[in-house]
Amino acid sequence: MKNYVTVMMVTLVMTGCDKPDALAPFSPEMASFSSEFNFDPLRGPVKNFTQKLVNDSGEVETEVNGTLSQEGCFETLNYSDKPSNSHLALVLDANYYLDAISREKRIRLQGKCQLAELPAVGMVYETNDREFVVKGHTSEVSTTYRYDDEGYPLGKTSKTKDAELSTVATPSDTRKKHDYSSVTTLNSKVIDTAKQSCEYDRHLNPSSCVLEITDASVTPPVLHKFTIQNEINYY
């Protein structure tokens, strides 16, 4: 949801019939879109979802809404960030995602429905043999993306001529991926740390989370607390 915020997942009692859904991997499209557009990836046959990041004053700071096809392609994706007063609304149309209002081509796709290019900023993406986006570059910035064996995003590193911004996320549980800690550095100096724990549904997707972010770029460091609310519907 934010560059330093990747979100969700803590206590689930599983039954034997839940295991196939719980172990479903993260699709290349879900993992790659969540890495690039700062929301939390979900696994399994997701039909639609809403993720809200709520601050300790009870205000919704960011909200992401998505609808997916049965093949796992995003049909619509909406993102709003109230602190920065920014909003993005995308709709799938053949090999592009269009601005839902202006119908301008925002994202070019490759393969089934994977990121290929952001024409407006000149960002071009590269995928690996598993179809996950692993690199992105413009004329001034290059970014590498990392995932675990199940496709869960482990962070990304962006480099310019004079700076390197990197986030490394480490899940604390091999199954409950959204219980994690992360460290973000700028030119090898820690600027924030985060820790998250969540409640999970039967697909091992987060239903709610508590996120604590420590801003280490100021003295003394400042702790920010958030809750994350998820509404998820499945096929």
Say what each PLM segment does.
Residues 17-235:
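Buried hydrophobic residues that stabilize the cores of well-folded domains
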